[in-house]
């Protein structure tokens, strides 16, 4: 089949809260982007059909190739989302949507592919020196959950992406304050993973733990209705709620620890890339937050980490971009 006959391609980036859809009408050209709340639809297929009905006027041809990035491990045909109610069979969904091919990949595999094609203005560098071209790149990012993956560029220019579930590693507190936060979380959960703190709901959990800290009993606090990640962040940046600022500082410190752990584990001299929608909301604060200092606080490996640049991804739809690149690789090479 001529390459032009594979367009439009149906792309999706499906997280725990929202599903983003788009139509790739030409290489790296995505149109009709829509964001739909997952909770509004009984199933993935229902959401896709609703999306396609909204794009009916723009569709000259029905898509026959699709690529979906989903925030959950892919282990065979049956897919169960980690942070929402959707479950689906890849093959049944392909048939239901009348697709010739449906590629389903982990969402942070898509993020890694997207990073391979990003330009300098898509990123904000936080410290470090320069990326080594063929060294591993670590990709992680807090959102509804916490994703982690690895991107390796071989000497011939080909790419290898290693998916992982690093967000579910056990959280290791760094100091007495983080021990207090961990103890609060441990009273609620059997396993306290990094994702418990480094996610949208994690900001709320950190705030709740800190609000019980001795000496903060009389500090101005948020009402129950205000306990959302967005409001905690806003109050922290406004400076009128010290406990919110401490929450955000603690969040960034914890992220620095995890990012350093991942960088050391992978030898990520190709850089660390922070994805997701949380950090770009407060990027100016993040640049001067405790993140970078904590990232480099690793004893004898401090100098090694000091040279590694950290980049915050600013691009709006990297999940869709990466899903498209993965599908292109599959159609060209019969593998991603």
UniProtKB/Swiss-Prot annotation:
GO terms for biological process: glycolytic process. ATP binds at residues 12-17. Keywords: ATP-binding, Cytoplasm, Glycolysis, Kinase, Nucleotide-binding, Transferase. Pfam families: Glucokinase. It is an enzyme of class 2 (transferase). One of its GO terms (cellular component) is cytosol. Its main location: cytoplasm. It is found in: Cytoplasm. Its EC number is 2.7.1.2. One of its GO terms (molecular function) is D-glucose binding. It catalyses: D-glucose + ATP = D-glucose 6-phosphate + ADP + H(+). Belongs to the bacterial glucokinase family. This is Glucokinase. The lineage of its organism: Bacteria, Pseudomonadati, Campylobacterota, Epsilonproteobacteria, Campylobacterales.
């Amino acid at each position: 089949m001529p390459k032009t006959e594979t367009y439009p391609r149906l792309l999706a980036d499906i997280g725990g809260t929202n599903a983003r859809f788009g139509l790739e009408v030409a290489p790296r050209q995505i149109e009709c982007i829509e964001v739909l709340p997952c909770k509004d639809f009984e199933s993935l297929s229902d959401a896709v059909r609703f999306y396609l009905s909204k794009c009916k006027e723009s569709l000259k041809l029905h898509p026959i190739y699709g690529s979906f990035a989903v925030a959950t491990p892919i282990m065979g045909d049956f897919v169960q989302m980690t942070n929402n109610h959707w479950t689906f069979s890849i093959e049944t969904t392909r048939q239901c949507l009348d697709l010739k091919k449906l590629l389903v990949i982990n969402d942070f595999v898509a993020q890694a592919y997207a990073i391979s094609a990003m330009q300098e203005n898509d990123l904000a560098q936080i410290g470090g020196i320069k990326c080594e071209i063929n060294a591993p790149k670590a990709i992680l990012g807090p959102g509804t959950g916490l994703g982690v993956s690895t991107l390796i560029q071989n000497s011939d220019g080909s790419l290898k992406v290693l998916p992982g579930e690093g967000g579910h590693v056990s959280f290791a507190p760094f100091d007495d304050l983080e021990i207090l936060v961990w103890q609060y979380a441990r009273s609620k959960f059997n396993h306290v993973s990094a994702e418990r703190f480094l996610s949208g709901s994690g900001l709320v959990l950190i705030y709740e733990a800190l609000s019980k800290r001795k000496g903060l009993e009389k500090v101005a606090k948020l009402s129950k209705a205000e306990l959302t990640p967005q409001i905690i962040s806003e109050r922290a940046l406004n400076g009128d709620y010290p406990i919110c600022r401490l929450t955000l500082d603690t969040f960034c410190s914890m992220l620095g620890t995890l990012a350093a752990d991942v960088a050391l584990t992978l030898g990520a001299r190709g850089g660390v890339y922070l994805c997701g929608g949380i950090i770009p909301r407060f990027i100016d604060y993040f640049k001067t937050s405790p993140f970078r200092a904590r990232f480099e606080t690793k004893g004898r490996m401090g100098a090694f980490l000091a040279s590694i640049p950290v980049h915050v991804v600013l691009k709006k739809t990297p999940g869709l971009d990466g899903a498209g690149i993965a599908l292109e690789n599959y159609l060209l090479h019969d593998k991603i």
